[in-house]
Amino acid sequence: MQKANVVKLVLLLMFNSVLYSSANAQFIGSLADLPPTIENYPLERLSERVYVVIGPHEWPNKKTKGFMNNPAAILTDEGFIIVDPGSSADVGRGFLEKLKCVSSKPVVAVFNTHLHGDHFLGNQGIRDAYPEVPIYAHQRTIERLEAGEAQEWHDRFNGLTEGALANTRIALPNKALKGGEVMKTGGITLKIHHPEHAHSDTDIMIEVVDDKLMFMGDISMNKWTPYTAMPQDASFKGTALALKAAIDNADVEVYVPGHGYPEDKTSMAIQIGFTEDLLASIKKYYLQGMQAHDMSELVKKDLQKYSAWDHFDELGKVISHAYVEVEQDNF
């Protein structure tokens, strides 16, 4: 009897090792080696309650059908809380299918960390299955999406993917957050943090107190050159301050970025270093009288230690927007 139990335990551990990995585990292989749709990406277990699919590092295109973010879920006593269900209804549905291998519990809430399309356009995939599910976002996210940016994001992704979002309807968040909320639900506690302006002016960071884990949205993008998607939305100094605040939170050990692998305080600090190095380099050449287009190659050279990051070749458009922030500070 004892031998049978040992065999069962070994089989269970083998199953879990295939299906999930811990937050500190090394991911095997390259994301580029995997097929582009969410169905082919593994569901990773980051903590006792948190699961995530690490998305590809490509911009939306026909092959990926727009999938690019890290859809995640928290399993509570009452059911799943989904964070950023992805960039289309199909991505949202695909993520739901993956969660069925963890539990048959329903989805009880959805959170969108900010207004960008790869984080909220998957809402419909959840709403179709759970029509009454509340979708939370910062009040500024809701305001901007309702003012027309939701349709702009849909049209942008549908164009980039050559029609992959043709059957995706817009499902807007309907529960406004301000930041500072402490939400107790299903046996867990969530703390909502809102930096005034970081990756955008709509960001929330979601702290899962019980698991010592924080969802960063796109304030954090691990080994992905920050700001390359929507630099016009960002505050560069604000992003660095938000990252510092997250690192200084002694109750958090694992950070889930909007793109890239899960992080610890060390890798988060490297991202702060990038922003500080970027602004310092731009300021150096600004004080020499250079315009943004004159200094672009020089700044890239100064930041060569980050050149292996995804989308580093697009740093030029980031420099032009960061230049404006430096100019305002030194006018």
PLM features per residue range, with description:
Residues 8-18:
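Bacterial N-terminal signal peptides
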Residues 49, 74, 84, 99, ...:
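Divalent metal-coordination and catalytic microenvironments
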Residues 1-8:
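Positively charged n-region of N-terminal signal peptides that target proteins for export
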Residues 21-25:
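Boundary at the C-terminal end of the N-terminal hydrophobic targeting segment
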Residues 97, 101-178, 182, 201, ...:
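Active-site HxH/HxHxD metal-binding segment of metal-dependent hydrolases
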Residues 48-98, 206-216:
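Conserved beta-strand hairpin/beta-sheet module of binuclear metal-dependent hydrolase folds
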Residues 26-33, 248-253, 262-331:
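Accessory terminal helices/loops
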Residues 79-81, 87-89, 182, 189, ...:
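Metallo-beta-lactamase
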